[in-house]
């Protein structure tokens, strides 16, 4: 009887994938790819507004011990007032900035290092789940190191991107505790500590992690792979490590007043609305409407997984989408079909399954995969689907890699033609090429989510020598709040001279949507008023020396064309400087 790892060898790729030592070479390749994309993004990339806000908080923590709103050591960051930001990502960036300096690449290093380290966790996890099945192990690792989302998120910091990497460590420690008797209590403890860290990595983990752990632990207990005392110990450790997060939940629910815990501030986020806007719990109306939304959520996610290049193809047609986080899925080309094939192989009744295509041989492997599938179904139904927010499901990408690896191994086992491994190698190369293509589009984008155009406009205004810089008020509240953040991010040398960010966001940001009163928005940026927001509706309103337009290109009459030098950046930001 043959296994996937002992199947007849059909060429260099098959031999390499079935070799035990290949994993180390794949990890080295993963490191090289991450470094290359990290450097490429520094050269050709940009700064996402969420990253800019994270760095603002990290800088403030490194300097003052408070976030950008003046709150000392918060458990979670009330960053946008209506939506929070990961404390794990922010505190790690703050530590690196404090130790190594205030540069964007330094703020990005913690996530890049975490992503790389997670490859070792993945290697250990696959060896525990698929012992002796080196083809499966190495294929999972290969699919992970060329994963578009991993390469993209290793290059810059989207705060929620820590969750998938933290979960890999949590699962490795947990499976090690289940499978190996040595130091079992220690590994259960490490596992629960990592699961707790996941709660501080992404607010949606408050749904994902409890659901996953309930299914996983019940399955392990039913299958007699875990003793009940270890389950109790795990609950206790998780509760202790997650206590600040749990206290935040009680404060947010109004069951507890604002408090401090071990030096951490736990305060209610009064305007927080993500729970309603990004989950099914915010669905209003009848039970039928809720059911329809649940079906839409699940259907949208499954379709996007089956056709993972959906956003990339849209970006190729509409360059304004370039840089969209969801351009970078769990895999390119036929990854969705391979994952579907792997799922069918996993679900196929055991009595009808061939030994050569039974890749999840151990009870623990089947429990882990099955638990993740169950958690995915619940999560995909509850969390609101949006094609441009597939990063919400990145925690399940390792599951998709495992299923896709089953599909790859099935092809290698079932077809003796040497064309099969060559085709698979070609698809891996195409995947990297497509990811590189998407990266290359950053130089052409014009989006309010990214700051390069605004940085250029602000630099031109500051270099003009004008004593005042007037920022033209936008009609879009989300453009306005992003401009407020980018101003403080790119003009860090003037941050002490600027007015507080919180009242500015309340007056100009998303919370001001629908308010027709313009006056509160026309406020000073600097304390001396030399930088301020103004309203420009007609050409005759242009009376000063220097203006910045964010998200719009002004139409100047002949008189103003002669009067002002126009500097246009990607048809998105414009600086007007009066000619000398």
Which residues does each predicted region cover?
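Extracytosolic helix-loop segments that constitute the early lumenal/periplasmic catalytic or substrate-binding loops
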Residues: 37, 53-91, 95, 270-281
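Short acidic/glycine- and proline-prone juxtamembrane loop motifs at membrane-interface regions
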Residues: 48, 149-162, 203
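Transmembrane-lumen/periplasm boundary regions of multi-pass, lipid-linked membrane glycan transferases
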Residues: 54-60, 64, 209-341
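Transmembrane-helix motifs of polytopic, lipid-linked glycan transferases
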Residues: 109-131, 169, 173, 341-347
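Membrane-interface alpha helices of multi-pass inner-membrane proteins
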Residues: 141, 186-203, 240
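Hydrophobic/aromatic-rich transmembrane helices and adjacent perimembrane loops
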Residues: 153-154, 207, 333-338, 366-415
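Signature aromatic-anchored transmembrane alpha helix within multi-pass, membrane-resident enzymes
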Residues: 193, 214, 239, 408-439
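Catalytic lumenal/periplasmic loop and adjoining terminal transmembrane helix
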Residues: 204, 421-570
């Amino acid at each position: 009887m043959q296994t996937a790892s002992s199947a007849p060898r059909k060429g260099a790729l098959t031999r390499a994938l079935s070799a035990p030592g290949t994993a180390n070479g794949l990890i080295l390749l993963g490191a090289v790819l991450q470094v290359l994309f990290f450097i490429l993004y520094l050269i050709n990339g940009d700064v996402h507004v969420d990253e800019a806000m994270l760095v603002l908080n990290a800088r403030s923590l490194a300097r003052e011990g408070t976030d950008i709103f003046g709150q000392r050591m918060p458990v979670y960051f009330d960053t946008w007032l209506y939506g929070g930001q990961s404390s794990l990502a922010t505190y790690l960036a703050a530590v690196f900035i404090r130790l190594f300096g205030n540069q964007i690449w330094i703020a990005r290093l913690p996530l890049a290092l975490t992503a790389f380290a997670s490859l070792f966790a993945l290697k250990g996890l696959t060896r525990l789940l698929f012992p002796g099945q080196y083809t499966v192990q190495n294929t999972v690792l290969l699919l992970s190191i060329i994963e578009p989302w991993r390469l993209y998120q290793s290059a810059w910091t989207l705060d929620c991107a820590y969750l998938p990497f933290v979960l890999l460590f949590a699962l490795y420690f947990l499976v090690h505790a289940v499978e190996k008797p040595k130091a079992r209590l220690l590994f259960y403890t490490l596992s629960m500590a990592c699961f707790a860290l996941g709660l501080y990595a992404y607010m949606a983990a408050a749904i994902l992690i409890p659901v996953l752990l309930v299914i996983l632990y019940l399955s392990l207990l039913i299958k007699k792979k875990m003793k009940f005392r270890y389950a109790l110990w795990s609950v206790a450790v998780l509760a202790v490590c997650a206590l600040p997060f749990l206290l935040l939940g009680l404060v947010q629910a109004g069951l507890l007043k604002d408090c401090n815990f071990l030096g951490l501030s736990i305060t209610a986020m009064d305007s927080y609305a993500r729970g309603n806007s990004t989950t099914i719990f915010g669905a209003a109306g009848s039970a039928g409407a809720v059911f329809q939304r649940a079906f839409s959520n699940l259907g949208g996610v499954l379709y996007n997984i089956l056709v993972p290049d959906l956003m990339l193809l849209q970006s190729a047609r509409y360059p304004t989408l370039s840089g969209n986080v969801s351009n970078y899925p769990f895999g390119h080309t036929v990854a969705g079909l391979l994952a579907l094939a792997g799922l069918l192989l996993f679900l196929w009744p055991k009595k009808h399954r061939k030994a050569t295509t039974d890749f999840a041989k151990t009870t623990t492997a089947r429990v882990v995969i099955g638990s993740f599938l169950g958690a995915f179904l619940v999560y995909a139904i509850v969390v609101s689907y949006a094609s441009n927010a597939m990063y919400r499901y990145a925690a399940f990408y390792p599951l998709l890699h495992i299923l896709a690896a089953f599909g790859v191994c099935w092809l290698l086992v079932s077809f003796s033609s040497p064309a099969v491994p060559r085709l698979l190698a070609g698809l891996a190369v195409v995947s990297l090429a497509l990811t590189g293509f998407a990266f290359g589009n950053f130089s052409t984008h014009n989006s309010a989510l990214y700051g390069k155009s605004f940085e250029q406009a602000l630099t031109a205004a500051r270099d003009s020598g004008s004593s005042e810089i007037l920022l033209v008020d936008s009609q879009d509240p989300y453009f306005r709040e992003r401009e407020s953040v980018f101003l403080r991010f790119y003009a860090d040398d003037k941050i002490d001279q600027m007015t507080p960010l919180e009242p500015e966001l309340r007056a100009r940001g998303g919370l001001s949507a629908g308010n027709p009163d313009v006056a509160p928005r026309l406020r000073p940026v600097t304390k001396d008023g030399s930088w301020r927001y103004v309203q420009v509706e007609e050409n005759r309103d242009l009376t000063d020396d220097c203006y910045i337009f964010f998200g719009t290109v002004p139409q100047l009459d002949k008189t103003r064309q002669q009067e002002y030098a126009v500097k246009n950046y990607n048809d998105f930001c414009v600086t007007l400087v009066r000619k000398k």
